[in-house]
Structure formats: structure tokens, C-alpha cells
């Protein structure tokens, strides 16, 4: 006679959820592909410290079992205790609500401004990289630089909790590692994958570098590249370049 222990002797709230993340595969059909939304969820789950599995989905030959699991849905999506969830923003909210303290880290930023910092960069970058008219290039590059400058200023401006009101020292520049402090938050999971794409693609197809004078952005990227949560969820530079090979337009007269 088979005996079943209630949840292996664990209370419902103590049992690890069964989570599977499905992300876009790279050009080889197996490695991690270029998809900032896939990386965003990958980073969130990694930072939460929860056990989860990752499956890369080759969009060219999507397996039948995945078609049945999430019909008509492109990655990223997750299954959480066998329930399919497909909207990235809603998945983020759900994970933050369900995977909560004391067992899991809270990842919401303390400062609301961190959520919107750099939010317009990707749109300006897309316009810049998709443009094929040489006469429009300079203005579009200026537009991108303006949004990068705004992010740089935010990263270099001290947050309220960096300023000690009782100290005689006047702190003019922030030394924090990430958008909202010295730890990654949901805001970083959203922005960093996009900022990395901007850096790689603009260099490859426009020979554009983020100016070294933007010390806040470079400090931010350097700190991100030192973290497994970012580098191990990131597609290779080659994969990012391949993804944009048809999107990035040559400047032709």
C-alpha cells in the first residue's frame, strides 16, 4: 500500500513552487537568444533565489508540446505549478507578490524614479538603428545621446538614503552600483538587458560608443557585468548582432 506524506511533510507555504521559464533560443536553436523580455524574467527568478528550470524555444521549429502548452504565444512565458502565465509585466507583478519575504527577496525599488529611469532610451535607439537616411542620422544620434545623458545624470545623482543629514560632508555624486542602490531591483531587470543591446548593436552597426564621460552609465554597466545574474542570463554579443543584422539599416544615399 502506498503512503503519501502531506506535501513531503512540508506546509503548503514552505513547499518550493515548480517553475519553468521558456525563453527565446539563439540562432543555433539552443543557446540563449536576443530577447530583453526573456532576460528580464530570467534575472528576476535568479535574483529571487528560487529553484527553476529554463527551456530555450527555437521559434523556427516550435515543438508541438509547447504549441499545446501556450498556443500562439511567443516566449518568454512561465509555468508556475503547471499554470501558464504569458504577459511579462503581469508575470513580474505575480512573482514579486508570490515569491515574497521572508523566504524570497523583495525586488521592487524603494524610489519610484528608478522605475522610469532610462525608459525612453530603447525607443530612441530603435529609431536610430532602423534609419537608412544619412541626413537623418545626426539628429537621431543626438536624440539617443540626450536620453543616455538623462540616465547618466540619474545614476550620478545621490539617492536620498545616500545623503546623511547629520554629516558635514556634502555628497555631490552617487557611488551606488545600480539604479536604486547597491542591489539589483526589478528596474535593473528591465533596463539592463536593453542597455546592453544598445551598447552592442550601436557599436557594431553605427560605430557608436556610449561616451566615456557618462561615468554613471559605465559604472552601472561595469557593476552589471560583474554579476552572474546578468552575465549568465545574457545572450552572447554575436547573438545580439545576428538578431539586428536585418533590422539595422545601412546608411545609403
Curated annotation (Swiss-Prot):
InterPro entries: CLIC (IPR002946), CLIC_N (IPR053823), Glutathione-S-Trfase_C-like (IPR010987), Glutathione-S-Trfase_C_sf (IPR036282), Glutathione_S-Trfase (IPR040079), Thioredoxin-like_sf (IPR036249). Keywords: Acetylation, Cell junction, Cell membrane, Chloride, Chloride channel, Cytoplasm, Cytoplasmic vesicle, Cytoskeleton, Endoplasmic reticulum, Ion channel, Ion transport, Membrane, Mitochondrion, Nucleus, Oxidoreductase, Phosphoprotein, Transmembrane, Transmembrane helix, Transport, Voltage-gated channel. Residues 2-101 are annotated as: Required for insertion into the membrane. It is found in: Cytoplasm, Cytoskeleton, Microtubule organizing center, Centrosome; Cytoplasmic vesicle membrane; Nucleus; Cell membrane. The modification Phosphoserine is found at residues 4, 132, 167, 236. A motif (G-site) lies at residues 35-38. Its EC number is 1.8.-.-. In the soluble state, catalyzes glutaredoxin-like thiol disulfide exchange reactions with reduced glutathione as electron donor. Can insert into membranes and form voltage-dependent multi-ion conductive channels. Membrane insertion seems to be redox-regulated and may occur only under oxidizing conditions. Has alternate cellular functions like a potential role in angiogenesis or in maintaining apical-basolateral membrane polarity during mitosis and cytokinesis. Could also promote endothelial cell proliferation and regulate endothelial morphogenesis (tubulogenesis). The active G-site contains a monothiol Cys-X-X-Ser motif which mediates glutathione-dependent redox catalysis. This is Chloride intracellular channel protein 4. It comes from Homo sapiens.
